């Protein structure tokens, strides 16, 4: 894995981002490419077309399956997510997404749902406002100097997201925190590379 974080060459970042789909495919996880395409392309459009942005229970379950496919599968959390009341998911995510662009309030609100922590909550926010919220991933966080050991807390996410927003601003040219996160994740090789 190269030291992408410390590179100031936009081409290095672009190359890493362009490898994202290939790295997704090389994970060897059933349905991950399809889930990732849905998460990146279909879910953001569905959220954007709603009068009041929110996710449904079915979308939250599918998003959780995407997150676990790309990272670590936690069956208990998925059971908890599936057990949420459908109306509560819509109400909670509607309230949360109305708090954008606050750096952490939407994450905190979404994390009130059963089985949802800052990482899953950040996936909802990232699908809604990729210019503000990156998805919270430990393989990405490990590449950002100064963050320390990954802690699945709102405070840690706040520092992580701020660092990725700052890097996106430095890269300019339309880069978002989500682009930075995906480039760093691709640079890591994903969980398949970390398991070696």
Located regions from the model:
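Catalytic DNA-binding helix-loop module of base-excision-repair DNA glycosylases/AP lyases
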Residues: 105-146
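A short glycine-/small-residue-rich loop at the edge of a beta-strand within enzyme catalytic domains
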Residues: 54, 97, 101, 131
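Helix-hairpin-helix/helix-loop-helix acidic hairpins
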Residues: 72-116
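Generic helix-packing signal
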Residues: 100, 125-126, 172
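C-terminal accessory module of base-excision DNA glycosylases/AP lyases that mediates lesion recognition
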Residues: 1-63, 132-196
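Short, well-structured hydrophobic secondary-structure segments
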Residues: 49-89
């Amino acid at each position: 894995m190269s030291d992408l974080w410390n590179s100031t060459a936009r081409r290095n970042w672009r190359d890493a981002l362009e490898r994202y789909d290939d790295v997704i495919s090389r994970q060897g996880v059933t349905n991950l490419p399809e889930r990732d395409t849905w998460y990146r392309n279909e879910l953001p459009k569905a959220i954007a077309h709603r009068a009041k942005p929110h996710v449904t229970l079915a979308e939250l379950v599918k998003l959780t399956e995407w997150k676990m496919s790309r990272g670590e599968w936690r069956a208990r959390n998925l059971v908890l997510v599936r057990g949420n009341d459908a109306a509560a998911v819509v109400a909670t995510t509607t309230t949360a997404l109305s708090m954008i662009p606050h750096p952490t309030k939407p994450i905190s609100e979404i994390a009130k749902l059963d089985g949802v922590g800052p990482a899953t909550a950040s996936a909802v926010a990232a699908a809604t406002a990729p210019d503000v919220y990156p998805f919270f991933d430990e393989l990405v966080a490990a590449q950002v100097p100064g963050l320390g050991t990954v802690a699945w807390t709102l405070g840690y996410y706040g520092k992580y997201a701020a660092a990725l927003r700052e890097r996106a601003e430095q890269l300019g040219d339309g880069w978002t925190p989500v682009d930075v996160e995906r480039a760093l994740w691709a640079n890591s090789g994903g969980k398949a590379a970390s398991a070696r």
